[in-house]
Amino acid sequence: MQHKLLINGELVSGEGEKQPVYNPATGDVLLEIAEVSAEQVDAAVRAADAAFAEWGQTTPKARAECLLKLADVIEENGQVFAELESRNCGKPLHSAFNDEIPAIVDVFRFFAGAARCLNGLAAGEYLEGHTSMIRRDPLGVVASIAPWNYPLMMAAWKLAPALAAGNCVVLKPSEITPLTALKLAELAKDIFPAGVINILFGRGKTVGDPLTGHPKVRMVSLTGSIATGEHIISHTASSIKRTHMELGGKAPVIVFDDADIEAVVEGVRTFGYYNAGQDCTAACRIYAQKGIYDTLVEKLGAAVATLKSGAPDDESTELGPLSSLAHLERVSKAVEEAKATGHIKVITGGEKRKGNGYYYAPTLLAGALQDDAIVQKEVFGPVVSVTPFDNEEQVVNWANDSQYGLASSVWTKDVGRAHRVSARLQYGCTWVNTHFMLVSEMPHGGQKLSGYGKDMSLYGLEDYTVVRHVMVKH
């Protein structure tokens, strides 16, 4: 396994403390990797800053060609990446290869094209004798912090728009799941000029803090927890850096009496438990109108009970383990607290799986109330709650009564209601009669404590640029 880091075009070993990297399906240590030192963090940022002088002035065509080459080598090495992701994250191998790798490749190809479509406003005379134009220019060095749930996918979401816009990047993947990012480093070093991409390894305190606080970093992009976002915003406040935050969610799934129940069951069975529920858009907070509540709970419980947890390399496995022992304990604690309320009923699951690895049974909880922690707090595991509601006004208020604002869905056959409710939901994305669908052309990002800024789409590309006015007297 490639375990070296990329700094200024060279693969190097870290000079800091060694950290274990685990296989969550077994609990075994895969390998130990040395963190970068503070001096290596500084070297990576300074390399990126030096490379920006030239990379920031390259043509969109040249940047697009590099991104397309990177997309091609990821596609060519798709099986290798999928196997690394499966071993390091516990993802079913078939899901990593068939679902994630094509989407990752598409992200780089999309932004390769988008790089050539990013324009400022056409020049015009708004003051006699002067011509004004609007430029969209890169910022400089971007520090990107990627999470552990979709390591390579999130690296793509961070790298592609930043590079397409002409920035240079220092990426820190999660210390829990670094292996695909380090493999990416090996392939990217021969495609991009030295310093344009730097990929480090280490924990937040020892590596993340000196990286995000570095005076030459102009922007910090994070996908992670609210707590991590709060820390980075506070840590970087004195230097007034631009920040781009995607901080999780607790997606409301609003199911009206007239919804297609079979479609809801099929959708939640898939989109509530994909990646073992470790997804910030997971369909995890169901509001079911009282007329169909009992039927939905019964049918969904039966469907969830058929989900198969197992070894990641088994073609029949639908759910792998959680990412770490610590996270398994967090998920288990959240469910135990829900059970202790007395009014929440476990329809299926509700316990750790016996044996090796960090497995938690796919769980459906019914009878949850609006103020329950299981409804209000992100669990980030294979746990879905169901709450009954009376009418449209009530459920819209309940759905919006959350600190999160990332994703939501509405299930109804009434087109007018679908538009009406979607317009009132305080979420970055609302799906109607589906959930979880993402495409590179559409923006992904939240409101409230789910953060700000957009990933993917031209809006995502714009987030990595600065708007500048140039006026010429003539």
Curated annotation (Swiss-Prot):
Q: Which reaction does it catalyse?
A: 4-aminobutanal + NAD(+) + H2O = 4-aminobutanoate + NADH + 2 H(+); 5-aminopentanal + NAD(+) + H2O = 5-aminopentanoate + NADH + 2 H(+)
Family matches, as InterPro entries: Ald_DH/histidinol_DH (IPR016161), Ald_DH_C (IPR016163), Ald_DH_CS_GLU (IPR029510), Ald_DH_N (IPR016162), Aldehyde_DH_dom (IPR015590), Aminobutyraldehyde_DH (IPR015657), PatD (IPR017749)
Q: Which PROSITE patterns match?
A: ALDEHYDE_DEHYDR_GLU (PS00687)
Pfam families from the UniProt entry? Aldedh (PF00171)
Q: Which Gene3D superfamilies match?
A: Aldehyde Dehydrogenase, Chain A, domain 1, Aldehyde Dehydrogenase, Chain A, domain 2
So where does NAD(+) get bound? 146-148, 172-175, 209, 225-228, 280
GO MF annotation terms: aminobutyraldehyde dehydrogenase (NAD+) activity; NAD binding
* UniProt keyword list: NAD, Oxidoreductase
* Catalytic-site annotation from UniProt: 246, 280
Function, in words: Catalyzes the oxidation 4-aminobutanal (gamma-aminobutyraldehyde) to 4-aminobutanoate (gamma-aminobutyrate or GABA). This is the second step in one of two pathways for putrescine degradation, where putrescine is converted into 4-aminobutanoate via 4-aminobutanal. Also functions as a 5-aminopentanal dehydrogenase in a a L-lysine degradation pathway to succinate that proceeds via cadaverine, glutarate and L-2-hydroxyglutarate.
Note in the entry: 4-aminobutanal can spontaneously cyclize to 1-pyrroline, and 5-aminopentanal to 1-piperideine.
What NCBIfam families does the record point to?
ABALDH (TIGR03374), PRK13473.1 (NF010000)
Q: What is this protein called?
A: Gamma-aminobutyraldehyde dehydrogenase
In its UniProt entry, the species of origin is given as: Shigella flexneri serotype 5b (strain 8401)
